[in-house]
Structure formats: structure tokens, C-alpha cells
Swiss-Prot record:
Start-end of each PFTB repeat: 180-221, 231-272, 293-334, 346-388, 410-454
Residue segments, region Disordered: 1-56
Location in the cell: Cytoplasm
Protein name as it appears in the record: Protein farnesyltransferase subunit beta
Protein role: Catalyzes the transfer of a farnesyl moiety from farnesyl diphosphate to a cysteine at the fourth position from the C-terminus of several proteins having the C-terminal sequence Cys-aliphatic-aliphatic-X. The beta subunit is responsible for peptide-binding.
InterPro entries (UniProt xref): FTB, PGGT1B-like, Prenyltrans, Terpenoid_cyclase/PrenylTrfase
Recorded GO CC terms: cytoplasm; protein farnesyltransferase complex
Organism: Pyricularia oryzae (strain 70-15 / ATCC MYA-4617 / FGSC 8958) (Rice blast fungus)
Cofactor: Zn(2+)
Amino acid sequence: MRHHTKNLRRRAIFLRTTPRGNMDSSSSVATSTSSSSNHRLVRSSEGSPSAGGDDIEEVIMTPGIATGRVQPAVSVAIPDLFTQLPPVKDDLATSTSKTQDETVAICLPYLAGSDANADVEHNAHGVPHIDRKKHVRFLRNMLRQLPAPFIAADASRPWFLYWSLNAMAILGENVKEDYAESLADTARSMQNESGGFSGGHGQTSHLATTYAVVLALAVVGDEEGLSLIDRRALWKWLCDLKEADGGFRMSLGGEEDVRGAYCAAVIISLLNLPLDLCKDSEAYIRDPTANLFTGLGDYVRKCQTFEGGISGQPDAEAHGAYAFCALGCLSLLGTPSETIPKYLNIERLISWLSSRQYAPEGGFSGRTNKLVDGCYSHWVGGCWPLIEACLNGPVKVSSLDVEPQPLFSREGLMRYILCCCQEQGKRGGLRDKPGKPSDAYHSCYVLSGLSSAQNRWQLVVGDDDMPAWMVSPFPNEEEIFDEKDRVGTVHPVYVIPEDKVAKVQTFFASRDGF
């Protein structure tokens, strides 16, 4: 019964209205409240690396939380679903349920437009505008010299390049003009003669950092930067990472997981690398008939758990980021409508993904019984276009105007992103949730999730009968965001601006050999 009621709570996100009845005033969500004053929670981000700006965030708890409802600060059209507690709640109190209640209490004022920052302008739907200028300034700072605590993230430097550049590109910045030369110099220092890119000069090549460098170079789109990639050495290195069970190790002698499957598939397809195995690789010696994609779908299949989600490795816990990696990988192995149901139980996966969206927050969690987090706007939110392509199959151009049947609450996700994930102080950037500091990682994936929620992706069959991804606004649907708050379109598999994917693939397809 306990699990049953929890699932009801999570699925409440799909309801458009909920009862207005008074909730128990002793609810653990409530802090000390009175009818005459607001109450302030001060949360410190001490201990988290900061690139400057506000490290203390004030969250105003408005009267009404004790009754399960927060009154909007202005008269706007905000559905009850996002301003009050869910109608179904498990009576059993645990440490997990308490932190969930605390998270709801922090998010509700932002969702209701009654948060502390009176300078934040809301539109007619009670949603703040995207503060592009402030977010871009924050992201540019993330590409400058960082404070001393960031030394702990030295091996992740390629990720800071990708996260920051991609987020700026999504916001409409021309990153090529300002960063092409410096990015090429930095990437060159990270490349090893044995193939692949490391976290920095003299470090070991890793599939995750290689993925990040390749995507950063793709986002900037400078041909000189793309040309510095040693594709032959990279191909041979990938052959050495190929395992007998079909998967890829993240580094030589390192771990094997579904991240490797996705990262390898992205790199191979984006850079037009041969699928043939290098003849002196162990993978070729084991099976001369195999190639880099042989058995990859079967490896992904083994990572689906009893819940329906995808784990990093077989027999581990399902996680939202691994679900995206699995779906992205399978979408590169063939048409999603063929490859995804071939290797995954799609009904169970949809059930698990649906359970990740919470009410009243509207955002996604990454695991069962975990909190919402802005980064899962992409890791889970980005799964839905791939799921829809799996269910609908490639469509004819004449079918593009068919009214889509949503599999998740787009409105809920966009409200969480715009209301709760924007750092509303002078710091800028995007974040996990109110009370957490903004960072490059969350800025990238929150904006990617926003792009996915704002646009409809479909696989379309053209005259050549070859399916291609096509993006368009959702038809016949009033949006809760103003048009000036629309961000750039992000490719549903490669997670970089869609136009960059075509340019990079065309560039490498035009090159003979390596």
C-alpha cells in the first residue's frame, strides 16, 4: 500500500486540477507560519565551489503553506496543481519523505510567483522570463580562471567547456567568434597520441572527456578546431575499449557502463569513424566478423532493471541519466521505432520515466524516492522525444500537423525550470532547485530540457525514404512562456544545437579516409 500511494502522488502531475480542500495544518511540509508575516529560510551553499556571486540564498515562505496552498503574489493563471500539496500523501514519515516535504515547501513560493525577489517579472501565466544576459555572464565567468576549490574538478575541465559553450549557444550566443582559437589550443593539449582526449595535459584518455571535447568543438563549429581531432588514433583507441559483451570501457582498464555505449556511439556517428575493428585490437582477434556496434544493443538490454528504468551496469539501480544514454545509443544504432523496442521493454520504461515527474514541483527526479533536480529536465525530459519517435515511427510530412498526445506534463516541467531553476540573484546561471547554487552543469542540462519541452521533435520520412529529425513548435497549443523566452533547438540525441550536428557530419563526410 505504501508504494501504491507514492505512485499515485507522483502520477498526480498528469491531473489538470486537484481538490481545494484544506490540508492538515500540522503537515510536516509546514514551517512556523503566521497570518501576518512571511518567514525566511536562509540556506548556505558553503562547501560548494563557487565562481563568485551570491553564496547565500534567501527563500521566502509565504503564509498558506501550512494549509497546503501558496497564494500567488499577483493575479495570474497558475493551475492549482502547482500551488498546493498533492491530494494523496503517504502517512508514514521517513527521512526521505521529510526531505521531499522540505523541497516542496521551498519550491511552492517560486511556483506561485510569491518568492522573495520582487524584481523578478512574471508573465500572464505566472512564469518568470529567461534572464539571458545574466545567465550568459555567469557562463562566460565559468570559462575564465576559476577559484582555488575548482582544482578538485581539474580532470573535468572538458566538461566545463562543453557545458558552458553549449548553454551559451542554446541562449543564442555566437560562441565561435569568441572561443574558437582558445578552445582549439585547450583541446590540443588534452589529446593523447594514443587516441582520445583526457581531462588535461598528461592525463589518461577517457571516453567521457573525449565526448565532452568533441561536442565542445562541434558547438563552436570551427573547421580548424575540428581538424585537430586525430580520428585514426581515436578510432584505434575505441577499438581497444570494445568489450566482448558488446559494451565499451570508459578508459583502458576502466569501468564498463552504459555511458560508454552512448558516448562511443555519438563519437563514431558524429565524426564518421569506420565501424570496422582495427585488426590488432583484442576485439578483432576475438571475433574478426564483429564491428564497433556488434552486441551494443544487447549490452544496453542487460541494463534494464525490474523497475523498468536503466542502470549504469547490469543488476544496478535505475537512473535517469542512464535511461537517456541507453535511448540515445539505440537511436544511433537504427531507427528508434525498430531498435528501442527490440532491446527494451518500452511499456515498463515509460512507466518508470512517468514516475519521475512530481507534483506540485513539476520537475523530474533521477531515481525512485529521490528529489527533483533541474539537470533531469534533460536526462529524463530528453528521453521523451526518443520515446515518441519509438512509438510513432517515422512519419510522412503530411502527418506533421497531427495533434500530439503528450506523455508528460510539458507545462509542469517548464514551470519548474523557469520558476525554480533560474538563479534570481546577481549571480545568474541555472541550478538544481531553490537553495542550491547555479553551476555550468545544471545550466547546460536545464536549458537543454527547456528546449526539449518547448519544441516537438519527429522523425520525418522525405522523398528519399530516409528518416531525418525535424523540429517544430507544438501545434494549436497556448504556451505558458512568452515567445521571447524561447531558446534554441537542441538535437534530441547529440544534445548540441541541431544545426551544428549537420555541419560537423557534413565536414567529416567530405574528408577522404582519416
